[in-house]
Amino acid sequence: MNQIESTVSEWPGVEVGSHDRGGGREFTLDGREIGHVHRGQLVDIPFAKRVRDILIEEERAEKHHVMPDSGWVSYRVRSDEDIEGALWLLRVAYLYRVVTLRKREETQVGGDAVDIDAALDELNVSDALEDAFNEVRVV
């Protein structure tokens, strides 16, 4: 789980702190949580409900272990191979938050350091997920 924290903490604007509910580490961007890692093998990530539904349908994540009807997802890290999946989900959450911040504030969160199109291409997101991003973008 240290690899997850060290990677996510390098993304522009991300702050890392203690997660109060259940222990672990929490990642925030502009004061809003983009996910947290529990001490065990569990990563929880908040999404807009539409994005969450796409991720569940694509079997990228599971419904949240405590709040299955919310926008949150859970992802279990059982081995080193699962770290990549956790990072993929956290990156999607980060990028979605950047897009919503840019739309709301009409500002470039992270400056030019975050190229949303290039990042989504690199993640190889599905058409459905890309459509969800496009719906909230500044046009």
Predicted feature descriptions by range:
Residues 1-139:
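Charge-dense, helix-prone N-terminal extensions
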